[in-house]
């Protein structure tokens, strides 16, 4: 083993960036094949290779940080900056959807009937399932904060309980959203209202699924005693991401469900 005179992690050569790029190519090509030729072979291949790449890449990161000690305070600081920049990029991603929604709704064209919601669209009642979804996500924000405080205080059992509650609430939100989509009186093809509604809420739903998966990984890592009160960036990143998902939903609820209806 060579002697290291600095606090930074010099990453070993890894095949995962290459396999990740190839899986992304397969997924995008597969989507085109699915849309135009109703063939899902390439898409399934891309999704499978992408899942395998993510599993093996993050397995390596966990090994390097938890078992090999490569994630020094300086490395963790860099990872925190990286996560902050990633969340900022996600904010800009959702800004595009809100821009499309407000561009269409604040000055509805004659084709839409000069009103919003457009003529013929029956919007969902914001005081029914959407309000329940809001309370579910707000409760999950409280429970993830409870988990974080429990971890900082060294209370492992409370941390696991709070994390489990957060995951359960995330899964419940996803099921409620799926039932709402199934019962919705309009579709993604119903003009600009349908497309902005389903694209914005659908991408948020995808982020909830990603965040829930992130938290499930943290739950199993905590079962194996991977986190301590001063070394838990994996969980911290998951908590930041979950709070971001909460805040985006509040904007979606106020804009699309309440004001937009």
UniProtKB/Swiss-Prot annotation:
<keyword id="KW-0496">Mitochondrion</keyword>
<feature type="transmembrane region" description="Helical; Name=VI">
    <location>
        <begin position="191"/>
        <end position="223"/>
    </location>
</feature>
<feature type="topological domain" description="Mitochondrial intermembrane">
    <location>
        <begin position="257"/>
        <end position="261"/>
    </location>
</feature>
<dbReference type="GO" id="GO:0045277">
    <property type="term" value="C:respiratory chain complex IV"/>
</dbReference>
<dbReference type="InterPro" id="IPR035973">
    <property type="entry name" value="Cyt_c_oxidase_su3-like_sf"/>
</dbReference>
<feature type="transmembrane region" description="Helical; Name=I">
    <location>
        <begin position="16"/>
        <end position="34"/>
    </location>
</feature>
<feature type="topological domain" description="Mitochondrial intermembrane">
    <location>
        <begin position="35"/>
        <end position="40"/>
    </location>
</feature>
<protein>
    <recommendedName>
        <fullName>Cytochrome c oxidase subunit 3</fullName>
        <ecNumber>7.1.1.9</ecNumber>
    </recommendedName>
</protein>
<feature type="topological domain" description="Mitochondrial intermembrane">
    <location>
        <begin position="184"/>
        <end position="190"/>
    </location>
</feature>
<dbReference type="GO" id="GO:0008535">
    <property type="term" value="P:respiratory chain complex IV assembly"/>
</dbReference>
<keyword id="KW-1133">Transmembrane helix</keyword>
<feature type="topological domain" description="Mitochondrial matrix">
    <location>
        <begin position="224"/>
        <end position="232"/>
    </location>
</feature>
<feature type="topological domain" description="Mitochondrial intermembrane">
    <location>
        <begin position="106"/>
        <end position="128"/>
    </location>
</feature>
<comment type="subunit">
    <text>Component of the cytochrome c oxidase (complex IV, CIV), a multisubunit enzyme composed of 14 subunits. The complex is composed of a catalytic core of 3 subunits MT-CO1, MT-CO2 and MT-CO3, encoded in the mitochondrial DNA, and 11 supernumerary subunits COX4I, COX5A, COX5B, COX6A, COX6B, COX6C, COX7A, COX7B, COX7C, COX8 and NDUFA4, which are encoded in the nuclear genome.</text>
</comment>
<keyword id="KW-0472">Membrane</keyword>
<dbReference type="InterPro" id="IPR013833">
    <property type="entry name" value="Cyt_c_oxidase_su3_a-hlx"/>
</dbReference>
<feature type="transmembrane region" description="Helical; Name=II">
    <location>
        <begin position="41"/>
        <end position="66"/>
    </location>
</feature>
<comment type="function">
    <text>Component of the cytochrome c oxidase, the last enzyme in the mitochondrial electron transport chain which drives oxidative phosphorylation. The respiratory chain contains 3 multisubunit complexes succinate dehydrogenase (complex II, CII), ubiquinol-cytochrome c oxidoreductase (cytochrome b-c1 complex, complex III, CIII) and cytochrome c oxidase (complex IV, CIV), that cooperate to transfer electrons derived from NADH and succinate to molecular oxygen, creating an electrochemical gradient over the inner membrane that drives transmembrane transport and the ATP synthase.</text>
</comment>
<keyword id="KW-0812">Transmembrane</keyword>
<dbReference type="GO" id="GO:0005743">
    <property type="term" value="C:mitochondrial inner membrane"/>
</dbReference>
<dbReference type="InterPro" id="IPR024791">
    <property type="entry name" value="Cyt_c/ubiquinol_Oxase_su3"/>
</dbReference>
<feature type="topological domain" description="Mitochondrial matrix">
    <location>
        <begin position="1"/>
        <end position="15"/>
    </location>
</feature>
<keyword id="KW-1278">Translocase</keyword>
<feature type="topological domain" description="Mitochondrial matrix">
    <location>
        <begin position="153"/>
        <end position="155"/>
    </location>
</feature>
<dbReference type="GO" id="GO:0004129">
    <property type="term" value="F:cytochrome-c oxidase activity"/>
</dbReference>
<keyword id="KW-0999">Mitochondrion inner membrane</keyword>
<feature type="transmembrane region" description="Helical; Name=V">
    <location>
        <begin position="156"/>
        <end position="183"/>
    </location>
</feature>
<feature type="topological domain" description="Mitochondrial matrix">
    <location>
        <begin position="67"/>
        <end position="72"/>
    </location>
</feature>
<feature type="transmembrane region" description="Helical; Name=IV">
    <location>
        <begin position="129"/>
        <end position="152"/>
    </location>
</feature>
<feature type="transmembrane region" description="Helical; Name=VII">
    <location>
        <begin position="233"/>
        <end position="256"/>
    </location>
</feature>
<dbReference type="GO" id="GO:0006123">
    <property type="term" value="P:mitochondrial electron transport, cytochrome c to oxygen"/>
</dbReference>
<dbReference type="Pfam" id="PF00510">
    <property type="entry name" value="COX3"/>
</dbReference>
<comment type="similarity">
    <text>Belongs to the cytochrome c oxidase subunit 3 family.</text>
</comment>
<dbReference type="InterPro" id="IPR033945">
    <property type="entry name" value="Cyt_c_oxase_su3_dom"/>
</dbReference>
<dbReference type="InterPro" id="IPR000298">
    <property type="entry name" value="Cyt_c_oxidase-like_su3"/>
</dbReference>
<feature type="transmembrane region" description="Helical; Name=III">
    <location>
        <begin position="73"/>
        <end position="105"/>
    </location>
</feature>
């Amino acid at each position: 083993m060579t002697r290291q005179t600095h606090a930074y992690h010099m990453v070993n050569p890894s095949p995962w960036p290459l396999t990740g790029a190839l899986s992304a190519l397969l997924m995008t090509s597969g989507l085109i094949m699915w849309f135009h030729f109703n063939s899902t072979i390439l898409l399934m291949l891309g999704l499978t290779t992408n899942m395998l790449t993510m599993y093996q890449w993050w397995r390596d990161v966990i090994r390097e940080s938890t078992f090999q000690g490569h994630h020094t305070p300086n490395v963790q600081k860099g990872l925190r900056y990286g996560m902050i920049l990633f969340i900022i990029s996600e904010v800009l991603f959702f800004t595009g959807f809100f821009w499309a929604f407000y561009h269409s709704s604040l000055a509805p064209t004659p084709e839409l009937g000069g009103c919003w919601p457009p003529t013929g669209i029956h919007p969902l009642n914001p005081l029914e399932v959407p309000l329940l979804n809001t309370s579910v996500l707000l409760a999950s924000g409280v429970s993830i904060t409870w988990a974080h405080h429990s971890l900082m205080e060294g209370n492992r059992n409370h941390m696991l309980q709070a994390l489990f509650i957060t995951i359960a609430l995330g899964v419940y939100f996803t099921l409620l959203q799926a039932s709402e989509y199934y019962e919705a009186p309009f579709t993604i093809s119903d003009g600009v209202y349908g497309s902005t509604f389903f694209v914005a809420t659908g991408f948020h739903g995808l982020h909830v699924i990603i965040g829930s998966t992130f938290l499930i990984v943290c739950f199993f890592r905590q079962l194996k005693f991977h986190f301590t009160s001063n070394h838990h960036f994996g969980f911290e990143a998951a908590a930041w991401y979950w709070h971001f998902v909460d805040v985006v939903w509040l904007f979606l609820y106020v804009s699309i469900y309440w004001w937009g209806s």
